[in-house]
């Protein structure tokens, strides 16, 4: 079974579109003999079930949202134990976004949910999709609304710093790689390379 794949990074970096294409690509002879299971972005379900919105940033509700999202992500991964999956986001995403509210990231880093998710990420292939392609920037009730790209692109550094701090090996899918075939080729090449480690 190939390594599980975690597609992480700031919003509007092409993660969900990439995952949809990966789902169609597999099985792929010589790489993966079985279809891949998909963990869809859990935060949308958590927000819908609990009445959260992106307007809750900076409030206690924002902090609660990040904790519930981390827990839901961990449960989604555990539900596919023994199955090959690709995950739209990961346990690290709510930790990054917790920094935008009152809650410190340390509180989430100390949870059992993060420790379990981190181990799966350390054993998997982590693709960090880089933000910065302005044509992809959008907002809705879930996504934060950025007035310019500077703050949005700064999230790249937060993801990289935390991945390194948590000893999670990752590769960056650069923002200028916009062709879907090139994005898919990048992921497949990294998956093959990681299987040889």
Question: What are the residue ranges of the model-derived segments?
Answer:
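Post-Walker A alpha-helix
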Residues: 18-19
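Conserved nucleotide-sensing/catalytic segment adjacent to the nucleotide-binding pocket
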Residues: 51-100, 105
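Conserved substrate/cofactor phosphate-moiety recognition/catalytic segment
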Residues: 24-72
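The conserved Walker
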Residues: 11
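Hydrophobic anchor at the beta1->P-loop junction of P-loop NTPases
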Residues: 7
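C-terminal accessory "lid"/substrate-recognition subdomains
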Residues: 164, 168-172, 181-197
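A glycine- and Lys/Arg-enriched "phosphate-lid" helix/loop adjacent to the NTP-binding pocket
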Residues: 102-179
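Conserved lysine of the Walker
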Residues: 15
């Amino acid at each position: 079974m190939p390594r599980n794949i975690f597609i992480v990074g700031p919003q509007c970096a092409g993660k969900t579109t990439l995952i949809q294409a990966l789902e169609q690509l597999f099985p792929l002879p010589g790489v993966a003999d079985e279809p891949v299971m998909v963990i869809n972005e859990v935060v949308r379900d958590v927000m819908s079930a609990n009445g959260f919105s992106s307007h809750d940033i900076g409030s206690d509700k924002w902090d609660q949202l990040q904790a519930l999202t981390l827990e839901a992500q961990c449960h989604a991964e555990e539900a596919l134990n023994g199955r090959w999956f690709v995950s739209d986001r990961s346990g690290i995403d709510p930790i990054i976004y917790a920094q935008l509210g009152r809650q410190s990231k340390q509180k989430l880093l100390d949870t059992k949910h993060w420790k379990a998710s981190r181990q799966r990420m350390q054993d998997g292939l982590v693709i960090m999709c880089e933000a910065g392609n302005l044509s992809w920037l959008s907002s809705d009730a879930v996504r934060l609304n950025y007035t310019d790209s500077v703050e949005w692109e700064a999230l790249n550094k937060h993801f990289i710093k935390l991945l390194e701090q948590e000893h999670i090996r990752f590769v960056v899918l650069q923002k200028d790689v916009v062709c879907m075939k090139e994005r898919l080729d990048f992921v497949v090449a990294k998956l093959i390379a990681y299987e040889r480690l």
